[in-house]
Amino acid sequence: MYINILKNNTSYRILASDIKYVKILCENIVIKTKNKIYKVRCDSTNLIKKLKIYGFVNSSENCIINLKYVKYINKLYIHFIDGDAILLTYDKYKEIIKIIKPKD
């Protein structure tokens, strides 16, 4: 699945599986992929709904992550395979741990 975004009158088509995380900063959205960072303005609600279908989860109220790029999680940060790290809220930490830890 591809996500279509518009930036400076140029349309970009991003493969959803290439997206590591999406941060919502006021009216701006930062989309971090394996190779690039996009800073755009678009409807974050629809974008988040689309990405959740593909296994993305919220790490805070303003950030959604792709678990396939996560190396490890502690109570404060999510650490990605490439060395990036983003803040994690405690409530979301508990939710994500339930998702990634298999039940006995």
Residue ranges and their predicted role:
Residues 1-104:
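Basic, polyanion-interacting recognition surfaces, primarily
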